Amino acid sequence: MVSKDQTSFNKRWTLGLLMLGLVIILWVLSSFLINLIFEDDSYRKPFFITYTNTAAFIFYLFPTAKAVVVNYKDTGRANVHRELIMEEEGTGSDSNRSVDMTSPLLTNLEAGTHANQKKRLTLYETIKLSAEFCILWFTANLVTNASLAFTSVASQTILSTTSSFFTLFIGAICHVESLSKSKVLGSFISFVGIIMVTKSDSHQRYQRHIADVSGDDNDAVQVLIGNLLALAGAVLYGVYSTLLKREVGDETRVNMKIFFGFVGLFNLLFLWPSLIVLDFFGWEPFSLPKDPKVVVIIFVNCLITFVSDFCWAKAMLLTSPLTVTVGLSITIPLAMFGDVIFKHKTMSALYLFGATLILGSFFIINKSSEEEHFENSITASNYESVEVPAANN
């Protein structure tokens, strides 16, 4: 029986890692696409693009909308609330059954407590959570997209993947994560790497434009702004992840499709006035894309965001949030490789060393977290072996 549980657990964990790999590829591809239309000023509209991408989450509600239409044709009543509850509770029941039938380890990857003791979020609680995190989610993605208008994809990717560094300390402040010497050491090494990458990228861009007569002396400042925006995105991701974990606890307690669907709906309904404000003050003049290439890129990027965020949520359920966050550091060499291949960029020794430090810091943090996860898994397994016979009696 134990062997079957372990085999099933390994299969689900492997599936989670495969989905994480897909997320990594899609996120880097999305960064290159956005950078492509920002770099040549063909359509530098970070707010509108982020608004469109986030609004695309509303398609997660389409299966429920379809069920409402079918129910209306059959009974003459729409009953939207009933269909939403069925989607929320029905998916939740299947999800919980799947976890119970495979391994108790899946429900105790982070907290070390028994997930079945926690009640699943109701429909109202899920919608409320979506409303609370809509602005924070949107702002995090906005500053990340905006950073691509000023800095390289490689630098943006490296700085964005430092989110685990901020998640660790913000989580410790909120009593969500525990600090250890290994985690602090890894975070310090990551911080040193950030300084090296930022300094190298700004210096290289500045030197290229000093040599170019038509270059702008302020370009180094723009690169620094881009790096700071990417860093701000990492901080906001850390805040978002920590607060979400504190509110939800176990990620299996929330239906991610309903959650993301209402994030998209609230974004669509409440953030459109910002487009008017940005246009009025001239910060981002509103205009729809006219170039077919830009239209295709924006559409493809919407699809990428839609698919990658679903895979990201599933990967978190199949593995653990920390595993996913640390695993996203693989985007660093992938983005750097893309810059070398597609843009023929050269990486300085300082840049490469800084990137190596950041990547190495994640291995240190991951090793420490893995040991904690193993201890929590053993505790959960022992708890399950005691509770199940008691329940049968």
Swiss-Prot record:
Membrane topology value: Multi-pass membrane protein
Residue ranges annotated as Vacuolar topological domain: 39-46, 154-156, 201-219, 279-292, 343-345
Compartment(s): Vacuole membrane
Keywords: Membrane, Phosphoprotein, Transmembrane, Transmembrane helix, Vacuole
GO CC terms, sorted: fungal-type vacuole membrane
TM segment ranges: 18-38, 47-67, 133-153, 157-176, 183-200, 220-240, 258-278, 293-313, 322-342, 346-366
Primary residence: membrane
Coiled-coil residue spans: none
Modified residues (Phosphoserine): S93
Other comments on record: Present with 2010 molecules/cell in log phase SD medium.
Protein name: Uncharacterized vacuolar membrane protein YML018C
Organism annotation: Saccharomyces cerevisiae (strain ATCC 204508 / S288c)
Taxonomic lineage: Eukaryota, Fungi, Dikarya, Ascomycota, Saccharomycotina
